[in-house]
Amino acid sequence: RRSLRIWNIHGTYNEKPSSFTIQYGYEHYCGCIGKIDSYLKGTYTYWVQKQKKEIAGIPEKLRKPQLQLEESWIDLFFFSNVYIMGLNLSSEEIDLLYILNLRSRWLRDSKKARCIQNRIVFYGQPAKAMKALLEEFDVEVCSSSPTPPGKNAKGTDYEKYYRAVLRDIQYRIKQAH
């Protein structure tokens, strides 16, 4: 049986749940993009118990499936179907847009494109320009069903919406198998 994991991508998670923090401010996001870029290119390193760890870049992981270890949520944008909900993809989410942009460029590279077989689906009602950008990034936009709650929505409206989105995701997963 396949498992479904939900990742909160806007934060940092170390070994302890108490270390989870949300990033605020452009300087944090710019720093995050630098780390994401290093991760994507295979130049990202980190230390665990005084041992230096190196991670293969996405191009190498595309060529060698045995390296696809899902070491980060970033990997999912290249190797798993991804369903995005609850984000408006404003400028604060530039890190996510950076990954989507790079992925779309790699989809136009014949060597990399045949290895990227996943889908990315966005739930929400983005502005017209953002919707066009997402579609250019090869992201499927589900803006009408289910309909997101409006500006004056109550908490229960959001709960109903998220449950409807999760049902839609479950349906899509069943259809794919």
Q: Where do the protein language model's features map onto the residues?
A:
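SIR2/sirtuin-family catalytic core signature
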Residues: 1-2, 69-177
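Extended, H/D-rich, highly charged conserved domains that either
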Residues: 1-49, 65, 69-83, 87
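Short, flexible loop segments at the rims of nucleotide/cofactor-binding pockets, characterized by
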Residues: 57-64
